[in-house]
Amino acid sequence: MSEIALTVSVLALVAVVGLWIGNVKIRGVGFGIGGVLFGGIIVGHFVDQAGVALSSPMLHFIQEFGLILFVYTIGIQVGPGFFASLRVSGLRLNLFAILIVILGGLVTAVLHKLFNIPLPVVLGIFSGAVTNTPALGAGQQILRDLGVPFEVVDQMGMSYAMAYPFGICGILLTMWLVRLFFRINVEKEAQRFEESSGNGHAHLHTINVRVENPNLNQMAIQDVPMLNNDNIVCSRLKRGELLMVPAPGTLIQAGDLLHLVGRPEDLHNAQLVIGQEVATSLSTRGTDLKVERVVVTNEKVLGKKIRDLHVKQRYDVVISRLNRAGVELVASSSASLQFGDILNLVGRPEAIDAVAAELGNAQQKLQQVQMLPVFIGIGLGVLLGSIPLFIPGFPAALKLGLAGGPLIMALILGRIGSIGKLYWFMPPSANLALRELGIVLFLAVVGLKSGGDFVATLTQGDGLSWIAYGIFITAIPLLTVGVLARMLAKMNYLTLCGMLAGSMTDPPALAFANNLHATSGAAALSYATVYPLVMFLRIITPQLLAVLFWGLS
């Protein structure tokens, strides 16, 4: 068998063994995709014992390409919501998550100086303790740029593997200790979250309001206070027995019923201006109007603003809602359309069919992947990651690297959505497949490289002390911020658990947090809010530590 064929066969074996290990769960908790690392260590140990020679250049390429695939698909997935997460609604969560990252870096620096831990080893311990694989890749790359020999750099993978198991267990233990210390009732926390979820990340609501303010009689809808901005859409108007789709210039009369769509706080303010909320139905049933959801798939309308479609003037149709990446938004006139957006249309059946044809509404396109934008994004990301950032006094230039460059580029492209006929929408199933393939390839190679000396390091070398250092890096930041967030900020416990899992970019911890209350989405919401920024910081932190420690040594 050729060296290349043998290398591919061994990698496939690692993936099979590792994924099987990851599927083994104890009390509902397992290593998940991290099991591939341990599969690689096991197979790597026996490969080393048997003296089997694998292709080093091929392994290096597979490791780097797997990392690129992983971080790029993450960026495309979270890109549409990343910049929104940095606004005020997610500011507090992101500040606590940033504090966890900073404390982890400080603990790592203290351990490095106190115990004189070799630089590659301490960076590997840091990456494993925070369960962040891209941090491992970024750390290895900066060490190579600093001229550290390859065999020394590979120690990072071994120390990463030593610290990784408690990295996962440490997050779960922190959640349990916070719950125990503050005597938290999870059911009550879920109820409080539901009661307060009207703020910040609220879903859209609808109300029916009777026009009772005499000052609004014979006034155009576009001139009514609270209806003349992009926060509320009036999608139906009922006058007597007649139900119609109103235009911005439609004149309202006293006694008219308006069907309004918006966030609860905006609807409340509009009600104070217009009149009393009524229970009268403004349903389209039994009328010549209907409501339909249509998907934007036509490249010709991508990037256009809703007002530029002129659907009301041309078709007598109103767009009442916009769903983007699972998030319900008000269909404001200034909103730009992206591939995969789902629009709620209200109008006559034949008019809605005409609008749907213009927007595309080709469901099969949602299952197709445009490969050209994928490789454009990866190529631009690699170029971005290769740009050196020279800082006075640093012995080497900082780079975003193969982990940070594609991630940042994917976040930007995911937010932009489309450029001309190119769109960066990726079906969730395709995104997940590429992401899992990438991380499996990366971890398989890291495990293989670490497997040869792993057992000897654990039993005869410094393996146990590395595990102890990892416990400090995991536990101190999590416990400190967990207690502060609950005690001082009075953070909801389920939200806190999601934030802790997100600060470590750890899917198994998120699964555990979600299982604390099966029907509450609090943990998943806070996880998604902090994940993008934390992922970026986790990639940058080992590079900063490497450059600083190298300069001081």
Swiss-Prot record:
The keyword Nucleotidyltransferase does not apply. Gene3D superfamilies: Regulator of K+ conductance, C-terminal domain. GO terms for molecular function: monoatomic cation transmembrane transporter activity. The chain crosses the membrane at residues 4-24, 28-48, 65-85, 95-115, 158-178, 371-391, 403-425, 437-457, 464-484, 493-513, 532-552. GO terms for cellular component: plasma membrane. It is a multi-pass membrane protein. Residues 192-276, 279-361 form the RCK C-terminal domain. It is found in: Cell membrane. One of its GO terms (biological process) is potassium ion transport. InterPro entries: AAE_transporter, RCK_C, RCK_C_sf, Transpt_YidE_put, YidE_YbjL. Belongs to the AAE transporter (TC 2.A.81) family. YidE subfamily. This is Putative transport protein KPN78578_40470. It comes from Klebsiella pneumoniae subsp. pneumoniae (strain ATCC 700721 / MGH 78578).
